[in-house]
Amino acid sequence: MSAKTQNVMRELKIEKLVLNISVGESGDRLTRASKVLEQLSGQTPVQSKARYTVRTFGIRRNEKIAVHVTVRGPKAEEILERGLKVKEYQLRNRNFSTTGNFGFGIQEHIDLGIKYDPSIGIFGMDFYIVMGRPGNRIARRKRCRATVGNSHKTSKEDTIAWFKQRYDADVLDK
């Protein structure tokens, strides 16, 4: 035991990856975006509604304008790896939130390795990654709920250090 062992409860892990395609209108484009997410994740995406009416964009309240899917486990890590490859393993400092989560967007879904289909077209998408530590469930469970201590919460610095070490990536200060 010459090397100091890390506490396994302090290790960061990916809790979930949320893929979002915001189309801005309901109809055919929304169903095509749904097909893209289904091809990528292998799961059925959920449609999101507009929260309020924006007349300049032609969006009405409760109109379905986006699709998203939540991926967990090894599949989330595999999709994240493909997304980071598109971004060349470089993210900006502002991509990381103060709560330790991070996100980024890509311009074209075909960069992820999905074959181009002329009937679907090309869509960009957002990646949102929620980070956590073992033991975070105590704040969300129904029975015997408790608070997570400040030293155990994920911070921006922790996530950036994990990101650099895990993916051998760069975080730009732009």
From Swiss-Prot:
Q: Name one GO molecular function term.
A: rRNA binding
GO CC annotation terms, alphabetical? cytoplasm; fungal biofilm matrix; nucleus; ribonucleoprotein complex; ribosome
Entry-linked InterPro entries: Ribosomal_uL5, Ribosomal_uL5_C, Ribosomal_uL5_CS, Ribosomal_uL5_dom_sf, Ribosomal_uL5_N
User: Which PROSITE patterns does this one have?
Assistant: RIBOSOMAL_L5
GO process annotations (BP) = translation
User: Which pairs are disulfide-linked?
Assistant: none
Q: Which UniProt keywords apply?
A: Cytoplasm, Nucleus, Ribonucleoprotein, Ribosomal protein, RNA-binding, rRNA-binding
Source organism superkingdom: Eukaryota
Which Gene3D superfamilies does this chain map to?
3.30.1440.10
* UniProt subcellular location: Nucleus; Cytoplasm
Q: What does this protein do?
A: Component of the ribosome, a large ribonucleoprotein complex responsible for the synthesis of proteins in the cell. The small ribosomal subunit (SSU) binds messenger RNAs (mRNAs) and translates the encoded message by selecting cognate aminoacyl-transfer RNA (tRNA) molecules. The large subunit (LSU) contains the ribosomal catalytic site termed the peptidyl transferase center (PTC), which catalyzes the formation of peptide bonds, thereby polymerizing the amino acids delivered by tRNAs into a polypeptide chain.
Quaternary structure (record)? Component of the large ribosomal subunit.
Family under the similarity heading:
Belongs to the universal ribosomal protein uL5 family.
Question: What is the protein's name according to its record?
Answer: Large ribosomal subunit protein uL5
Species this chain originates from: Candida glabrata (strain ATCC 2001 / BCRC 20586 / JCM 3761 / NBRC 0622 / NRRL Y-65 / CBS 138)
Gene that encodes the chain: RPL11
